[in-house]
Design a protein with these regions (language model features):
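Non-catalytic connector elements of ABC transporters
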Residues: 1-69
Length: 69
């Protein structure tokens, strides 16, 4: 994975809760849970599943989710 953001927090997905258009994704990063709101489409494109390794990517006022691959 190559990304310009410098703050990448590696963790495990502990919850993926889809709403009508937006999903809330919770990632456990060394005992601290980080929550991100992303589109349902992004969840599907990333194939996010509970137990999967993922990254909370923090840039300015945004938190994004990324995976290896």
């Amino acid at each position: 994975m190559k990304i310009s953001a410098r703050n990448k927090l590696k963790g495990k997905v502990v919850e993926v809760r889809k709403g009508q258009t937006t999903a809330h994704v919770r990632i456990d990063v060394s005992g601290t849970v980080v929550m991100a709101s992303i589109t349902n489409e992004a969840v599907d494109e990333l194939g996010l599943k509970v137990g999967q390794t993922a990254y909370a990517v923090v840039k300015a006022s945004d938190v994004m989710v990324a995976i290896d691959g």
